[in-house]
Amino acid sequence: MGRRSFIRGTGSYLPERVLTNDELSEMVETTDAWIQERTGIKKRHVAADGELTSDIAVHAARRALEAAGMQASEIDLIVLATTTPDQTFPATATAVQAKLGTGPGAAFDVQAVCSGFLFALATADSLMKQGLFHKALVIGAETFTRIIDWSDRGTCVLFGDGGGAIVLECVEWDGADDAGVITHHVRTDGTKSNLLYVDGGVSSTGTIGHVRMEGNKVFKHAVTNISAAIEAVLTETGLTSADIDWFVPHQANKRILDGVAKKMSIPEEKVVITVSEHANTSAASIPLALDHVVRSGRAKPGDLILSEAMGGGFSWGASLFRL
């Protein structure tokens, strides 16, 4: 008998303020048609003044707890994936812990940009399987619009703010191997960090900086690396894409989603796409999309889900789990 983690609930949150493509066209040289054709994005949400990453995370976490039928006091682990923390330190997860009023336990951040949620999920799952923790919140939350150069049309049209969360519970398990959280594949190639980065930092410039990206190169690496991560998970488990009920990818842009689906021969109807409604929310996008497909009733208990992502670093990965 071993230990197995199960997803007990999902939740998400998007700030009230909506920024449309037409509004962006008044700020930079672009159009709604240009943005939609190249990215599939129609709008993005922007955090209000004074609305922190921890606030967004708390909203998403509360909804996940409600869906799980659990109280915050039952949680003994919080792993928060974010690139846009409230402060340099302490970890934003500690603010989430305090605001939620969770029980005694651990709370820390993981930073792997757009693939951060998968790294956070793999970390929480590993710690729980060791018996160190029993009930966890795994959260992705971002105020990414605060590191955007609004004069750079190559990046400012792509990103938005938001948060998503899941509740994980780890229990003694002697059942089927393909139940709950099944496996993860995470990788990083630091030699490509100059292709997608923020040009500022505490120890380098002493400034916050803005997102800089070589879009065409990022696209090519994303399709290649994400496809490789999917293949690694399928090979490890002896599955094929036909066995997967839903692919819930990082919502970067529709061109990348379509490129991966084509390369891996994944039917379009199996791919969950929400990027049109909230743009690229970095670490928040996978739990946002997962919550969407669950609450819409499309994904049902027992469905097999594969999530995949790539972000700056480059860091990428995939996780396989059954609802």
UniProtKB/Swiss-Prot annotation:
CDD domains hit by this protein: KAS_III
Catalytic activity, as annotated: malonyl-[ACP] + acetyl-CoA + H(+) = 3-oxobutanoyl-[ACP] + CO2 + CoA
Family statement: Belongs to the thiolase-like superfamily. FabH family.
GO terms under cellular component: cytoplasm
Biological process, per Gene Ontology: fatty acid biosynthetic process; secondary metabolite biosynthetic process
Protein name per Swiss-Prot or TrEMBL: Beta-ketoacyl-[acyl-carrier-protein] synthase III
MF-aspect GO terms: 3-oxoacyl-[acyl-carrier-protein] synthase activity; beta-ketoacyl-acyl-carrier-protein synthase III activity
Subcellular location: Cytoplasm
EC numbers: 2.3.1.180
Top-level division of the source organism's lineage: Bacteria
Pathway(s) of this molecule: Lipid metabolism; fatty acid biosynthesis
Keywords for the protein's UniProt record, in alphabetical order: Acyltransferase, Cytoplasm, Fatty acid biosynthesis, Fatty acid metabolism, Lipid biosynthesis, Lipid metabolism, Multifunctional enzyme, Transferase
Main location: cytoplasm
Active site residues according to the UniProt entry: C114, H250, N280
Recorded domain comment: The last Arg residue of the ACP-binding site is essential for the weak association between ACP/AcpP and FabH.
Species annotation: Hyphomonas neptunium (strain ATCC 15444)
Subunit-level organization: Homodimer.
Gene (UniProt): fabH
Known role: Catalyzes the condensation reaction of fatty acid synthesis by the addition to an acyl acceptor of two carbons from malonyl-ACP. Catalyzes the first condensation reaction which initiates fatty acid synthesis and may therefore play a role in governing the total rate of fatty acid production. Possesses both acetoacetyl-ACP synthase and acetyl transacylase activities. Its substrate specificity determines the biosynthesis of branched-chain and/or straight-chain of fatty acids.
